[in-house]
Regions:
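Short beta-strand immediately N-terminal to the catalytic nucleophile in serine-hydrolase-like folds
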Residues: 6, 153, 286, 553-555, ...
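N-terminal targeting or regulatory segments adjacent to alpha/beta-hydrolase or S9 domains
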Residues: 399-449, 712-718
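C-terminal helical "tail/cap" subdomain of flavin- and related membrane-associated enzymes
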Residues: 63, 313-409, 428
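N-terminal cap/lid segment of alpha/beta-hydrolase-fold proteins
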Residues: 435-476
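Alpha/beta-hydrolase superfamily serine-hydrolase fold, recognizing
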Residues: 461-718
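Conserved N-terminal helical subregion
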Residues: 1-3, 20, 45-184, 227-241, ...
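Conserved mid-domain beta->alpha element of the FAD-binding
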Residues: 8-33, 152-153, 179, 209, ...
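Active-site substrate-recognition segment that forms the wall
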Residues: 195-229, 244-247, 269
């Protein structure tokens, strides 16, 4: 087999090395006459270092590069530490290899040295490609035609090979320009720049800086809004004074560091949207040709290197079925690269927030993450905690997709799989890339599209005190019982309007009315905003003459945790307690210490450790996550009203439910626990599931026993 590789950058050279490592003949076709790179640093994380180790190149990389001890996040103006991600030996033990910072030219050189001269043709530009049943053909600018069995497009974001497969496609500008520079060590004396990722974050701008040659050469990447740079070309040397103006208010150490730049060049931050197909017959794409991404998460080169190993491995196993091998390569890689593309864009958005309230919210989230994720696995693990050498030996379906779900995970029943798929496709890559804004919009779309309010149901906007809510009554309800319901969404997404259909079934279950509450959401409104709103809403019901003995407090996921926290707060304040609590898969432990958070991570289409960390930290921020009003699992549960709690076997938050039920029972609470099989997180919001019908019937019977009829039928506020 002979594989033609279009492009001799990091992806192309690594592909050549990987294929030769597996005994496959290669020819790299590179248009540049010399393999060199513009002076810049590059980060090679554990996921990529593991592959280079297989080639015997890690020692060479270690000899010329730097192993940073941490990523230190600082405020650009004050220099105050915001967050620290430990690296060094600690990260090497955690991820299987260290992180390396290296000069891009040094990396290209060591890769090029591993590819013999006869396997490279430089100064050779590809202008056309074609294929037939027997092989592929590349036409060069000289009109020479080169034949092979496989063509791999490693020719970057402007790929000729991609254009052949897919036609011209739009690439997107992130409206960010990056100033890059390399500074000799002698110009940085006295600045105490340790062998760490020294990062500064300001409104709409960042400084990503680190050593690329030990105590010899320092790399700076300064990102700024595009409108702050006035020039016709973004590809050559820039005006240093223009860069410095963008960092006028930087703290002294950062400012002095920038002043040591003797030359800078500018690049734009571009990307393409994820695609669902990059292979056709004997031709495939790799690296930026397939999945160009913004340069964050230390992921761009790493994904190319992972691609290269996967491609080589599957081709070596399926040499008699080249098209099938290339499709398997795509199947194994596409879910992961799509996830990294979306995650990198989300990181860019997060780190370039420009409005002061959003900067405050982001920094608050980092405070929270430092409490429950001190090793920064949520921030970096999605890219780094992956061993492609091991993964390619397992089933393709084990790879995690955009939402952190194992791509091949399936349920046994048709109805269960229907609910599973609704969760699986609720959040698109574009939604994820927009951070909590995108997740919020997507979750409301998911709920309102799939669970519309049925005809005949009365739903009206209301206010409980100062808290917005919806009042829902199902047809034919007669009693004056009331459900006070709190929607789920990790305290960060979700809305009362999105839960109207479920609220109508809750109202029917108690033969009364359901108020679903629009409590304030994080990160804009961290703790105690949600609990304050919950208390106000409950007291507003009492002020309308509704008896506590006729109120059922309800919630799913974070809403279930909030319902429990509400009752704890009411007990402490001496308020009358509601008659009962319904908690569906409650998010009751925001420290994420439950064993199923780890055990079922990747099996749950609705929740995973990274998402729960992001959401939980957004809510409690600088507050203690073990506070029972944040994590009611840690509260004194004695004296709570009767509790009906339910969850699905195999879901991430299962252990929150089971531990809560166990602790409540030990405290003397009247507990009803129902666990269902082969289902999904907060299964009760899916009205078509048989287990939903069964559970809601049980809840109705249970509620009849626990609630006392209210003498005054509740009315919406005028």
């Amino acid at each position: 087999m002979r594989v033609l590789i279009a492009g001799g950058g990091i992806g192309g050279l690594t592909t050549a090395i990987a294929l030769r490592h597996h005994g496959i003949d290669v020819l790299v076709l590179e248009q540049a006459p010399v393999l060199n790179e513009i002076g810049a640093g590059i980060q090679i994380a554990a996921n990529a270092a593991i592959v280079l180790r297989e080639f015997g190149l890690e020692a060479a990389m270690h000899a010329v590069g730097v192993k940073p001890q941490s990523y230190d996040y600082r405020d650009l103006r004050s220099g105050r530490m915001l967050y620290q991600a430990p690296l060094g030996d600690e990260a090497a033990a955690r991820y299987g290899a260290p992180m390396y910072n290296i000069h891009r030219a040094d990396l290209v050189q060591l890769l090029s040295n591993a590819v013999p001269a006869e396997a490279k043709r430089l100064g050779t530009r590809c202008v056309a490609v074609s294929q037939d049943k027997d092989g592929v053909e590349v036409t060069l600018q000289t009109a020479e035609k080169v034949r092979g069995d496989v063509l791999v497009g490693c020719d970057g974001i402007h790929s000729i090979v991609r254009n052949h497969l897919r036609g011209e496609e739009e690439k997107h500008f992130a409206n960010i320009l990056m100033w890059r520079s390399l500074i000799p060590a002698e110009r940085l004396e006295g600045l105490n720049l340790e062998e760490r990722g020294n990062y500064w974050f300001g409104p709409g701008r960042t400084l990503i800086t680190y050593w690329v040659r030990p105590k010899k050469l320092y790399s700076i990447l300064a990102s700024v809004p595009a409108h702050e740079v006035q020039r016709e070309s973004w590809d050559d040397s820039g005006d240093i004074s223009e860069m410095l103006r963008s960092f006028d208010d930087a703290e002294p150490r950062a400012r002095k560091m920038l002043e040591q730049c003797s030359s800078v060049f500018i690049t734009g931050m571009f990307y393409r949207d994820p695609i669902d197909d990059w292979t056709s017959g004997r031709i495939t794409l790799l690296g930026d040709a397939a999945h160009p991404m913004v340069p964050f998460l230390a992921a761009g080169a790493g994904q190319s290197i992972e691609d290269a190993w996967t491609l080589a491995r599957v081709l070596s196993r399926r040499q008699d079925d080249i098209p099938g091998a290339l499709l398997e390569y795509q199947q194994r890689r596409l879910p992961r690269t799509t996830r990294i593309q979306a995650g990198a864009r989300a990181a860019v958005k997060l780190m370039h927030e420009s409005e002061p309230p959003r900067v405050r919210d982001r920094n608050g989230r980092w405070k929270g993450m430092a409490r429950i994720d001190p090793l920064a696995e949520t921030s970096w693990g999605l890219a780094w905690a992956y061993n492609v050498v091991k993964a390619v030996e397992g089933p393709p379906g084990e790879v995690l997709n955009t939402t952190g779900l194992r791509e091949g995970k399936r349920l046994q029943r048709v109805e269960g799989q229907r609910a599973f798929d609704l969760w699986k496709y609720a959040f698109r890559p574009e939604d994820v890339s927009r951070g909590h804004d995108g997740l919020r919009a997507a979750y409301d779309r998911f709920l309102t599209t799939n669970f519309p309010l049925l005809e005949g149901v009365s739903a009206a906007e209301d206010e409980l005190g100062d808290v917005k809510a919806w009042c829902v009554s199902a047809p034919g309800t007669l009693r004056g019982n009331v459900v006070l319901h709190f929607h789920g969404g990790g305290y960060m997404i979700g809305s009362a309007k999105g839960s109207l259909e479920y609220a109508s079934r809750l109202a029917a279950a108690v033969d009364g009315t359901c108020y679903t509450v629009d409590y304030r959401l994080a990160p804009e409104h961290p703790y105690p905003a949600a609990i304050d709103d919950a208390v106000m809403a409950y007291r507003a019901l009492l002020s309308r003459g509704i008896r506590a003995s006729s109120i059922l407090v309800s919630g799913e996921s974070s809403g279930g945790g909030l319902a429990l926290a509400l009752v704890l707060a009411l007990r402490t304040a001496g308020d009358p307690l509601p008659a009962a609590i319904l908690a569906v898969a409650p998010f009751a432990d925001l420290t994420l210490s439950g064993p199923t958070v780890k055990a079922f991570n990747g099996d749950d289409p609705a929740a995973n450790r990274d998402l729960l960390t992001f959401m939980g930290a957004s809510y409690f921020q600088g507050h203690e996550p073990t506070d029972p009003l944040v994590s009611p699992l840690f509260g004194d549960l004695a004296g709570l009203p009767p509790l009906f709690v339910t969850a699905t076997q195999g879901e991430v938050l299962l252990s929150d439910t089971t531990r809560l039920a166990e602790r409540a029972q030990k405290a003397g609470v009247d507990v009803t626990l129902r666990l269902v099989e082969d289902s999904v997180h907060v299964y009760t919001i899916f009205p078509f599931l048989p287990e939903t019908k069964t559970t809601m019937e049980e809840v109705a019977a249970w509620a009849r026993r626990k609630l006392r009829r209210n003498e005054t039928r509740p009315q919406a506020a005028e």
